[in-house]
A protein has these predicted regions:
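ATP/NTP phosphate-donor binding region
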Residues: 1-86
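Short glycine/serine/threonine-rich phosphate/pyrophosphate-binding segments
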Residues: 38, 94-101, 122
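Gly/Ser/Thr-rich beta-alpha loop segments that engage phosphate groups in nucleotides
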Residues: 62, 93-95, 130-131, 145
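Hydrophobic, well-ordered secondary-structure scaffolds
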Residues: 69-75, 92, 105, 120-124
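Short glycine-aspartate micro-motif
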Residues: 87-89, 93, 112
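A glycine/threonine-rich phosphate-anchoring loop and its flanking beta-alpha core
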Residues: 101-159
């Protein structure tokens, strides 16, 4: 599988096109509390984000753990996610790592898209298929290599 990497400042239109082409039965946006508050308003013109079920996790690397992962899995279940659903991870490395791992493991694999909002996540965490969580005091102790269907990188978020 080849990962599609898109550089654009028209995130809304690009995301809408990618989701339309994927034709999922449901769309979920995973983000953290900071991105939910400060960044998602910049995507108010994105019909995909507006119509998606939002899953918000606590911010910070300390929350990239099995408890947050379990919360995401539960909300995916409660929201009716299936293997035909699509997860969009909008955030920094914590969100793209944890969201990607949730996608890789839920129902044995759900398609996902990463929209990194930090420079580090744009060049490292969101690209290359590294997903995972911290466990037992160790960083990225549990994880999988699972590439996102697409990574949308924009300097709009790197203010």
């Amino acid at each position: 599988m080849s990962q599609k990497i898109v550089f654009t400042n028209d995130i809304a239109a690009t995301l809408d096109t990618i989701v339309d082409e994927a034709a999922p039965n449901r769309v979920f946006v995973i983000t953290d509390v900071n991105v939910d508050y400060f960044v998602l308003s910049r995507l108010s013109d994105c019909k995909t984000v507006a119509g998606a079920t939002r899953i918000v996790i606590k911010s910070g690397d300390i929350n990239k753990n099995v408890d947050s992962l379990s919360q995401v899995w539960k909300q995916l279940c409660d929201g009716g996610a299936s293997r035909k659903s699509l997860i969009i991870n909008i955030g920094g490395g914590v969100v793209t790592d944890l969201g990607g791992f949730a996608a890789a493991t839920f129902k044995r694999g759900v398609r996902f898209v990463n929209v990194p909002t930090t420079l580090l996540s744009a060049v490292d965490a969101a690209v290359g298929g590294k997903t995972g969580i911290n466990f037992n005091g160790f960083k990225n102790e549990v994880g999988a290599f699972c590439e996102a269907d697409a990574v949308i990188i924009s300097t709009r978020f790197l203010d």
